[in-house]
Amino acid sequence: MDANLEAILYLVSGVLFIVGIRSLSSPETARTGNLLSMLGMAIAIIVTIIGLGDITDPLTMGMIAGGILLGGGIGAVVALRVPMTDMPQVVGILNSFGGIAAVLVSVAAVLSPADFNILDATTNALFLGSSIETSLGVIIGAITFSGSIIAAGKLQGLISGSPIVFKGQHPLNALMAISAVVLVCMFVITGDATWFWAVTALAFLMGITLIIPIGGADMPVVIAILNSYSGFAGAIVGFTLGNTALIITGALVGSSGAILSYIMCKAMNRSFFSVMLGGFGGEVAAGADGVEETRPVKRGNADDAAFILKSAGSLIIVPGYGMAVAQAQHAIRELTDELTERGVSVKFAVHPVAGRMPGHMNVLLAEANVSYDDVYELEDINSEFAQTDVVLVIGANDVTNPSAKTDTSSPIYGMPVLDVENAGTVLFIKRSLASGYAGVNNPLFFEDNTMMLFSDAKKMVEDIVKAL
């Protein structure tokens, strides 16, 4: 293929990626954004295959076709069979694929540098820039791979969702980071691949030790950070391969993931480093002063909730992780339809870090065909709680905790929360009075205008619909 035509097609592919990502910012254009991004990827893949040279070689084309069919087949099966409630785990696994791909390409480049045109014929060693590229690619890729596997394991429940900490953890991570820099320098200076293999093994270990101390409450940020890592790893590999489309795509994914991480950290009033250092929510506190709460709560059932909702003129539903665990989104949609027919104004309030991945609640509500126009972000709806008759909270513990605004000793102090306590009545569906991932009790449970509905979220909502 002509070099100029190849460059133009890669540029078109990059533009499609940019427009596609931009379209994902709105639910109304998200589907179009996905299609544009798919088209961009298809163009990039076809151009890359043609650019290999002899595309008539049966072995080469067989390997390419086999890879496309195998990967596409697995992806299709996953997309069709995995429920939307498991999307955080899927995103974590997909991030790990990006990481291991970067590792494999970097390893291949070190093993056969001549095939990648990165071998200096005069010294019979990798070019200086190529040595740095492959080292960075394998470090970021390996950390992304092992870290994403740990994150997915935590989300799936295969690994404890609580922070796993041990004495000397932070000094150990710092020591490994310094060691990685030293190993890279030795590889670049000497060209001895032994240093490269050492830093590869160390990076895999770093991915584990960096993620295990991070608790479930911070998983949305971790997923965004690992997504960013996978993007930057891909961009670095793009330089090694000399692939413009891969550089553009990796840079887009990396930068957008980094920006999303910053936005979510800001939404929790946490710094990036405090999230990555982990340990948040590791000690379960009973209350603001460490004393277990013994105050009585107002308990209710489905009939009580139905009676209150029948008399309401306005309702705001606040979904949380409890909705995802119980897979209650479709039952909630039924409740919404029933109340709307009765003339009740129903809106949804979504906190930026509700759930276990960025946009977790939005994805689940979209699956249940909840209208995009009825879903509001924190800053757009917080002022409306004071004028709302009833708020229905479904397992959204920490993001509705008023102590974030009043208790300076609370771990979540300063985190923007939904002002649900200002509503006329708060119906809170929860299995028990247990604290959330932040490890602090929610004083909202004990307010006079709060009624606790202890049950599985899906069952309780279904019972409320029946009672209506």
What are these regions (language model features)?
Residues 31-40, 64-65, 86-98, 163-174, ...:
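Cytoplasmic-side transmembrane-helix entry/capping segments in multi-pass membrane proteins
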Residues 1-14, 56-73, 130-145, 191-202:
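Structural signature of hydrophobic alpha-helical transmembrane segments
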Residues 16-29, 72-91, 148-163, 206-219, ...:
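C-terminal ends of transmembrane helices
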Residues 48-65, 77-87, 103-121, 190:
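Transmembrane alpha-helix boundary signature
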Residues 291-468:
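Structured cytosolic domains appended to multi-pass membrane proteins
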Residues 108-122, 189-194, 221, 228-248:
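Transmembrane helix-loop junctions at the membrane interface of multipass transporters and ion channels
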Residues 215, 230-235, 239-273:
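Mobile "lid/hinge" segments at catalytic clefts and subdomain interfaces of large enzymes
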Residues 252-312:
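Membrane-interfacial segments at transmembrane helix termini in multi-pass membrane proteins
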